[in-house]
Amino acid sequence: MTKSNDTEIKDTILKNRPNIAQSTLKTYMSSIRNVGKKIGVELKTIKDIVKHNEEIFNSLTDSNLNDRKTKLSAFIVALDDKHNSISKEVDEIISTYRDRVKVDKAKNIERETNQELTESQKKNYIPWNEVKIVYKKLKIEAEPLFKLDQLNVAQFQKLQNFVLLSLYVLIEPRRSLDYTAFKIKNVNKENDNYLLKKGKKTFFVFNQYKNSGRIGPQTIDIPNSLRNIIVKWSEKNPFDYLLVNSLGKTIGQSKLNDYLNQI
C-alpha cells in the first residue's frame, strides 16, 4: 500500500492545534484525503487546499450536516495558522468555510431540539433573542455577587445560574453531559472535563461527551469573558464540580435541563 504524501498538511494541523487528539487528527486527515479523491485532486500541501478551495467547498454541498461540518473543520484547522500572518485570500476561505459550519451547527441543533424535546420542554423553550434578554438581566443581578465574601443559598444559586447560562450564550451550546462531568477542582485530566490555561489562551477540554469513546478528547477555545466567569466562580464554589446540587454533588443531565428551564 502506498503511503499518502500529505505530511505537510498533517504537520501544519499539529502546529496549528498542538493539543489535538490523535483520533481527531486521524479523522481530519481522512476527511481531507476523501475530499481530494472526490474532486480528483491529490491534496498534499496547504497551497493545494487554497488552489482548489472552491472545488472542495462545492463538493460538500450535498453532504449531510455532520459530515460536511467535520470535513470543513479539517480544512479550517489546516488553514488557520496561529503562528504566522495569513493572506487575505486564505482568511476569506476560512471565513467562508466557518460560516457554512456555523449554519450547519445551527441547523443540527434545531433539528435535534425538535426531535428530542418533550412536550413539557417545548413549552419552556424560548427563542434565542429572548435568551439574550434573560442573560443580560441575569448578568446585572449576578455579577455584584462575585464581590461578596460569603454567599447565602439563594445567592449561590443565582451565580450558578449565571455560569450555566453563560456556557450556552458565550460559546456554541453543547450537550448536558459535557458540563455535568466538568470539574474545577481535583481534576483528573484523563477522565474529567476541565478548564485549561495555556499562555494567553484558555480552553475547555472534554473527555466525556457523546461519542467521546469513538472520537477522543475535544479541546475548544473559549473567550476571555467566559474564562473570567469560570475563574471567579471557582473562587466562590468550594466543590469539585462546576455545577452542583444542594449537597455539593454533580447534577444529573435532566436536572441541568431543569435548571435551564427555571432561569
Q: What does each model-found stretch correspond to?
A:
Residues 6, 14-99, 222:
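Non-catalytic DNA-binding core/recognition domains of DNA-processing enzymes
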Residues 37-40, 80-84, 168-173, 180-187:
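Hydrophobic/aromatic-lined pockets within catalytic cores
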Residues 49-59, 195-208, 244:
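Generic recognition of long tandem-repeat/solenoid scaffolds
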Residues 71, 156, 160, 256:
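Hydrophobic (often cysteine-bearing) scaffold residues that line and stabilize catalytic clefts
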Residues 87-147:
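Flexible interdomain linker/hinge and immediately adjacent N-terminus
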Residues 128-177:
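Basic, Lys/Arg- and aromatic-enriched nucleic-acid-binding interface segment
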Residues 181-224:
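Conserved tyrosine-mediated DNA breakage-rejoining catalytic core shared by Y-recombinases
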Residues 219-263:
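Active-site/catalytic core of tyrosine-dependent DNA strand-transfer enzymes
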